């Protein structure tokens, strides 16, 4: 890092991994890469990038918003011509399918400030991807994997678990990063399902879950008033009493409710 004399930018959510052991663990979790095109978001100084390339992917596309950091990768680009390329862009606005061919795996230490928005974007085009191996702030990972009746369970949990198998692999202490963040991080693996667990319109489900979890302490009968004019019919068809609170419903029950609104 000292070689480039670049200070990480808090505005871009930059926290770089110091430990090569951690980068190895992350890439090993992604499994075989030789037959896959890989996307990395925010390669930074290249610690994770080098480890990905060491596992011989079919190709690696790195997306980096910081123009100064893009310049740090000239040596890697020369060493891996035809296999590694870096695009200077905001990952939130990149159209991945225009830049890379399937099959695609994503391996990334996601910038804190865009991690949630980026994951939601990917969920909406989930069939493009084979697997994700991702590092989030622990609190975001907690929300993704949360189960019913837990404090972190919400709209993000429902949508993620409808579309994917998700597993928390390990947590990482702040001391393993530069600069040192104030929070722990978590690495999760995400495997998109061939089809949704339950048949449901995703737009209707998202509208429903966001509305009721915005009033998560209210009983469903009350929180649904702002979502549908068929509250009682929807509850009856979904076999719900209306006295439940949003956190009590399973993913399947949310899908039944959305289908009957």
Curated annotation (Swiss-Prot):
EC number: 2.1.1.182
Keywords: Cytoplasm, Methyltransferase, RNA-binding, rRNA processing, S-adenosyl-L-methionine, Transferase
UniProt name for this protein: Ribosomal RNA small subunit methyltransferase A
Name of the gene encoding the protein in the UniProt record: rsmA
Location of the protein in the cell: Cytoplasm
Species lineage: Bacteria, Pseudomonadati, Pseudomonadota, Alphaproteobacteria, Rickettsiales
Enzyme class: transferase
GO molecular function ontology, one term from the record: 16S rRNA (adenine(1518)-N(6)/adenine(1519)-N(6))-dimethyltransferase activity
Organism encoding this protein: Wolbachia sp. subsp. Brugia malayi (strain TRS)
PROSITE patterns linked to this entry: RRNA_A_DIMETH, SAM_RNA_A_N6_MT
